[in-house]
Amino acid sequence: MKIAIIGSGIAGLTSAYLLNRQHDITLFEAADWVGGHTHTVDVTVAGQHYAIDTGFIVFNDWTYPNFIRLMQRLGVASKPTEMSFSVTDPDSGTEYNGNTLNSLFAQRSNLLSPRFWGMIRDILRFNKAVQKDLADGQIGAAVTLGEYLREQGYGQRFIDHYIVPMGAAIWSMPLADMLNFPLQFFVRFFRNHGLLSVTERPQWHVIMGGSSAYVAPLTASFAERIRLNCPVQRVDRHSDGVTIVSAAGSERFDQVIFACHSDQ
């Protein structure tokens, strides 16, 4: 078949990689580079080279089984890394890191702080209660994180110094917007990534040489089928296929794969 693929993120590139073996594929990319959220900046400091990932950074052995198999097939190496959460609030003077007990109480004054211990109690309560409430159908689709926290009486220290900054860091959102986040999605994401447990956590990994290191081997077999700077303007469906209207003109295909964000 003649297949059009729109978007060159991991979904589009993997689709092209697999389908190119038996089909005539064309990959359309609006930007002048491929890789989607994958973006590595190479930096040299004092003669030492660093590959800094500013987009896709890490993956884990719980939720990325297909990606791991793909990297193994491509021969792309990875290595284990740590994922920890730290908070520093100059206004309140609060500072901690959740990686170990020692780093949790890096500020020894927190050992005697009722508010800090209250935050820890709220963390344990939230981790248990929110999973039960979701399983019992007590969390409606329209319920936000902020509504739930207010209704259940969670402390301000837990809100300001744990759950809101953690969510904002994960989704790159302003702190003020995090309380309006849909709670159902929030809980499912946290549960799937081991963030609602203090003991059972997945092993995280990084691509050696930076995340962009997988792009070249992934695209090697169909590099000539990639069209950069070629945004798709319209897709018309027919009984026997589709018409793709892009910067390159109008073309017919048997199938189309939308490997892009829904608002694109």
PLM ranges: what are they?
Residues 188-246:
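Helical element adjacent to the flavin cofactor pocket in flavoenzyme catalytic cores
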Residues 2-27:
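N-terminal Rossmann-like FAD-binding beta1-loop-alpha1 element of flavoenzymes
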Residues 20-44:
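Glycine-rich FAD pyrophosphate-binding loop
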Residues 41-67:
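N-terminal glycine-rich dinucleotide-binding loop that anchors FAD/FMN and/or NAD(P) in oxidoreductases
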Residues 26, 51, 79, 225-229:
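General small-molecule cofactor/ligand-binding pocket signal
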Residues 6, 232, 251-263:
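Short hydrophobic core segments
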Residues 61, 65-183, 187-188:
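Mobile amphipathic helical/loop "lid" adjacent to a hydrophobic cofactor/ligand pocket
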Residues 11, 33, 263:
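Conserved Rossmann-like nucleotide-cofactor binding loop
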